[in-house]
Structures are given as C-alpha cells and as structure tokens.
Curated annotation (Swiss-Prot):
InterPro entries: KsgA/Erm, rRNA_Ade_diMease-like_C, rRNA_Ade_Mease_Trfase_CS, rRNA_Ade_methylase_Trfase_N, rRNA_adenine_dimethylase, SAM-dependent_MTases_sf
Protein's name in the database: Ribosomal RNA small subunit methyltransferase A
GO molecular function: 16S rRNA (adenine(1518)-N(6)/adenine(1519)-N(6))-dimethyltransferase activity; RNA binding
Family annotation (SMART domains): rADc
A Gene Ontology term for the protein's cellular component: cytosol
CDD domains reported for this sequence: AdoMet_MTases (cd02440)
Native source species: Synechococcus sp. (strain CC9605)
Length: 274
C-alpha cells in the first residue's frame, strides 16, 4: 500500500512539505551526527524521514497520527536500519524510542493547531522544563508563532511566549517557508526555527519559575498598559517602585519592553521580600 489514494486531511492540519531546498535546510539545521537518535513528529508521506535515514543515524523514531499513512510509511521504511514508527497523538504518545531511550534531537512539521501544547511537551514550562532536555529541536511552525518565539524586547511580536521560550532555550530562525512549498498550500506563511534547550545550570531556578510565570500572566493580560497598572497589587507601590529600579526598568514601561532576564530579576526581588 502506498500513498496514491490518500489526500491531506484538514482535521489533522496536514500540509506536506515538498520543497527540496527547505527539506535540506532542516537537515542541515539539525546538525546530525551518526550517533544521534532522532524523534520525528508528523512524518506524513516520509519526505523528511527519507533524508533522516539517509544520514545514517543511530535511530529515527516517527510518530504519526493518521492511521491511513502509517501502513505506507511502514511499507516504505520498515527495512531501513534504526527506523521505528508509532501510530498515535504526539500529545499523548510515549516519546521514548523503541529501545526505551530518549531521542537526542527532534525534527517536526508541526500541525499549527497543536503548536502551543506540543512546545510545552517537547520543551516544557518554566516551572517544569523537560529534563533531560533534547539537544536541539528543528521545527516547522506558523511564521507568526516563530516571530513571537524569537522576538526581542520592544518588538511588536514580543510576548509572554517570547519570555518563556527564551528562558528555556536559545532560539533562532533557519529559513522562511512560503505556502508554495507545501501540498496542499496553507493559507499562512511558515518558518523553520531551531531551539537549543538550555542546560539546567542556565535555567530559571524552580523557586523563581512560578513567580516569573505569575508575573507574565498578569502583565501581558493588558500588554498595552504601563507596568505601574498591570503590576499593581504584586507589591506595595513604593516597594514595587524600588524593585523596578533594582531590576533596571521603569514602571512607565510596558511589558513587551522588558527582557527575559529583567522578569527574572523582578521575581527574585519579590521572592526575597516574601
């Protein structure tokens, strides 16, 4: 059984990447080594799977939700050394490889409707990061999400997601991916991004993580308002003013102007006074 009778399903968010140059950029960004074990999310018809296996990796484990694609993938790759396949929802399926080991790296053409939950599963949250972290994740996502992940303070795309992800991983853009690179073409622009999760020694300490998360939720709920308004109530006004000065910002600023490290500094100051 092949893929000739299978059409992309909207409910699964299926848009198959066919552009050779983008596929190659993903492989290059993953910086693959012969000892790597790679988790592939959403192999589809196997265009990227084929290139991963050609790299001579230790193992490639793919997770595919669509039952109708699974048999075609097995037929195509079952004889390939190191290949394994799990049919299921990546938000619920075990992420360990067939030998029980954890993958070194992740590559994924993410269905855009599960980007947030999948990022949390693969990278974690500030107060509960994935540990041990993957060495590297190369992800194809909606351009709008990519811009929010890698945005710098002061940029219109800078958000609570920007702060969270940048406190969990180093993030950079690999390449833009226009709709014509897919079949069928999506209605939005896409982008390949690379995430390199931070080691435990560089992550926010657990006692600060919950405080940072609380501050982000409160401040970015009204991102256009000044911090003197959005942070009102987290501390007595004069103390809050002193904490802001110590952390290096003004309460006249807006939340999208503060760097991730500044949020950590504010959380640390608040924790000292509790």
């Amino acid at each position: 059984m092949g893929f000739s009778g299978h059409h992309a399903r909207k409910r699964f968010g299926q848009h198959w990447l066919l552009d050779e140059s983008v596929l190659q950029r993903i492989i290059e960004a993953a910086d693959l080594q012969s000892t790597d074990r790679v988790l592939e999310v959403g192999p589809g018809r196997g265009a990227l799977t084929e290139r991963l296996l050609a790299a001579g990796l230790k193992a490639v484990h793919a997770i595919e939700l669509d039952r109708d694609l699974v048999q075609g993938l097995r037929d195509r790759f079952v004889v390939q050394p190191g290949f394994s396949l799990h049919q299921g929802d990546v938000l619920e399926a075990p992420l360990e490889l067939s030998d029980g080991r954890i993958a070194d790296k992740v590559v994924a053409n993410i269905p855009y409707n599960i980007t947030g939950p999948l990022l949390e599963r693969l990278v974690g949250r500030l107060d509960r990061p994935v540990d041990p972290p993957y060495q590297r994740l190369v992800l194809l996502v909606q351009k709008e999400v990519a811009e929010r992940i890698r945005a710098r303070p002061g940029h219109s795309s800078f958000s609570a997601l920007s702060v969270r992800m940048q406190l969990l991983a180093r993030c950079h853009s690999v390449c833009p991916v226009p709709p014509r690179c897919f079949q069928p073409p999506p209605k939005v622009q896409s982008e390949v991004i690379c995430l390199e999760p931070l080691p435990a020694s560089e992550r926010v300490m657990p006692d600060l993580a919950a405080r940072v998360e609380s501050l982000l939720k409160q401040a970015f709920l009204a991102r256009r308002k000044m911090l003197r308004n959005t942070l009102a109530g987290v501390a007595e006004p004069n103390r809050l003013k002193d904490l802001a000065a110590s952390a290096g910002f003004s309460l006249q600023q807006r939340p999208q102007e503060l760097a991730p490290a500044t949020w950590v500094a504010l959380a640390r100051g608040l924790n000292r006074g509790d």
